[in-house]
Amino acid sequence: MKNILDLTKEELQQEVTPKFRANQIYQWIYQKGAKDFESMSNLPKSMREELKEKFTITPPKILNVEVSKDGSKKYLLGLQDGHTVESVLLPMKKEERDEKGNILKEARYTVCVSSQVGCKVGCEFCLTAKGGFVRNLTPGEIVEQVLTIREDNNIPANRRVNIVYMGMGEPLDNLENVAKAVKIFSDEHGMSISPRRQTISTSGLAPKIKKLGEMNLGVLLAISLHAVDDELRQKLMPINKAYNIESVIQAVKEFPIDQRKRVMFEYLMIKNLNDDLKAAKKLVKLLHGIKAKVNLIYFNPYPGSPFQRPEPKDVEAFQKYLLDHGVLCTIRESKGLDISAACGQLKEKSHGCTL
């Protein structure tokens, strides 16, 4: 049987008649959290029986959760075939109430989702790569990560969250399923998470960046850059052999994006490797003419890693150079340092592996 969460609403409309029933089913699953068809009380009994015969609603199992002092939560989720993926809940702003208990400002969250079991790209600094590639996630398996985390944290269905495709896997290597997940998330009868609240991160698959742009999904784009010259980037990210920095930058320049938004460039700061002002100067030159935002990320060490976390003073100096030269730059607040929050850490930890 099919997992009904794999279907966009348009696909579901081909399965049920009349078509408006697809809207109701979406509302039951994505707004009311229904886990079975019998509870969908405004559907005819005959339709509920038919749905039970054709489809399943199969949420993943929560195998492990680690909670950080900063409120971040790292989830290890078990899929139906026994494989596991990781997802992370990142609280961005706390809820504020007045003395009467009325909500002044709603809490804001970002959910980091995985797109594959394992990864083909093989970045040297990423623990997920050590386990190799197993398979792509289905659209439903991507969507289920957010549903599961939302339910586990009692996040109201009408609370908008941001989604970043930055977990395990290379999203553009699973582009068709990721694109379907974007549509499912953004459907008005579902979670109504605007594409502008969804960021797809890529290691730099230049042709797929172009294809993503042609799909006109309206999502935000993030590029995992991490180096400013091909020699170093190739050592850190073998994908650079196929798609060098120049080809990635050209693909970014051609990518359609809302005029109010910017392309994010993620730059992992590694001590004594890419964290000096010489690299900052090259980065400014590289991004000339691009409406970009650079996100500096502290390397999150894992057992056996050959890399080290950079000094805060070096990261701050790097940021200052970029800002002084007209490049918008932020330092990502490190979250989950006490909970194995780097990709792949919780999975390896749960399996008792030492790397």
UniProtKB/Swiss-Prot annotation:
Its EC number is 2.1.1.192. GO terms for molecular function: 4 iron, 4 sulfur cluster binding; metal ion binding; rRNA (adenine(2503)-C2-)-methyltransferase activity; rRNA binding; tRNA (adenine(37)-C2)-methyltransferase activity; tRNA binding. Disulfide bonds join C112-C343. It comes from the Bacteria. Reaction proceeds by a ping-pong mechanism involving intermediate methylation of a conserved cysteine residue. Specifically methylates position 2 of adenine 2503 in 23S rRNA and position 2 of adenine 37 in tRNAs. m2A2503 modification seems to play a crucial role in the proofreading step occurring at the peptidyl transferase center and thus would serve to optimize ribosomal fidelity. This is Dual-specificity RNA methyltransferase RlmN. It comes from Nitratiruptor sp. (strain SB155-2). The gene is rlmN.
